[in-house]
């Protein structure tokens, strides 16, 4: 599967309320990670550090050698993914995905909504217009070796169709000030709802 880039959500002035950035998701074939080798153990320690994960948690995820696939960490920053790829640990792989960013944060969250780790809309405009924003994933048929490397392409490549951008009628600056005033009053009056 070739992932499509989700469309952006913009305010009426074209300022970005939601956009997608490349992210690296790390996965493993536990039986292919030889934790008995000192050089692999050293690389796993560095992998855990790069991901901000305790080494014990990483080792636990890799302990079940009966599993043929396990996610280690989803949607890491792309540059961290490149550092992980440079470690070249046998049995550890990565997949390019997209991660949503919301520059306006809480001030527009109730309108914009959010997506889950699978990049599907869960609330707000992200949910209501999921089909428009999501686009369509592409595909290509390939033959892979046991290490997950592409050996040969077979058949045609269907390119992904990126999602469409959506422009809202709200003004993010006005929204920000209204949100601030509302938040200040909630705090001042110790409101619970």
Tell me the role of every PLM-derived stretch.
Residues 2-4, 137, 189-193:
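Short, small/polar residue-rich loop motifs at catalytic or cofactor-binding pockets
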Residues 34-42:
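Short, conserved charged micro-motifs
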Residues 18-23, 28, 42-49, 60-164:
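Small/polar-residue-rich segments within soluble enzyme cores
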Residues 6-9, 141:
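Generic short beta-strand
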Residues 69, 151-191:
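Conserved, well-ordered alpha-helix/loop/beta-strand core segments that scaffold catalytic motifs
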Residues 6, 40, 170, 174:
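Hydrophobic (often cysteine-bearing) scaffold residues that line and stabilize catalytic clefts
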Residues 1-7, 22:
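Membrane-interface junction motifs in transport/secretion proteins
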């Amino acid at each position: 599967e070739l992932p499509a880039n989700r469309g952006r959500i913009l305010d009426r002035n074209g300022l970005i309320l939601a956009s997608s950035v490349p992210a690296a998701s790390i996965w493993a074939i536990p039986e292919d990670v030889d934790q008995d080798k000192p050089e692999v153990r050293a690389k796993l320690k560095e992998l855990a550090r790069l991901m901000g994960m305790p080494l014990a948690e990483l080792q636990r995820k890799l302990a079940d050698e009966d599993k043929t696939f396990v996610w280690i960490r989803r949607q890491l920053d792309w540059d961290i993914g490149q550092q992980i790829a440079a470690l070249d640990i046998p049995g550890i792989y990565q997949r390019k995905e997209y991660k949503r960013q919301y520059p306006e944060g809480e001030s527009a969250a109730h309108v914009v909504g959010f997506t889950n780790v699978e990049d599907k809309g869960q609330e707000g405009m992200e949910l209501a217009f999921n089909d428009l924003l999501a686009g369509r994933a592409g595909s290509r048929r390939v033959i892979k070796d046991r290490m997950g490397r592409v050996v040969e392409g077979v058949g045609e490549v269907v390119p992904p169709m990126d999602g469409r951008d959506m422009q809202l009628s709200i003004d993010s600056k006005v929204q920000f000030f209204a949100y601030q005033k509302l938040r200040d009053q909630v705090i001042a009056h110790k409101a619970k709802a």
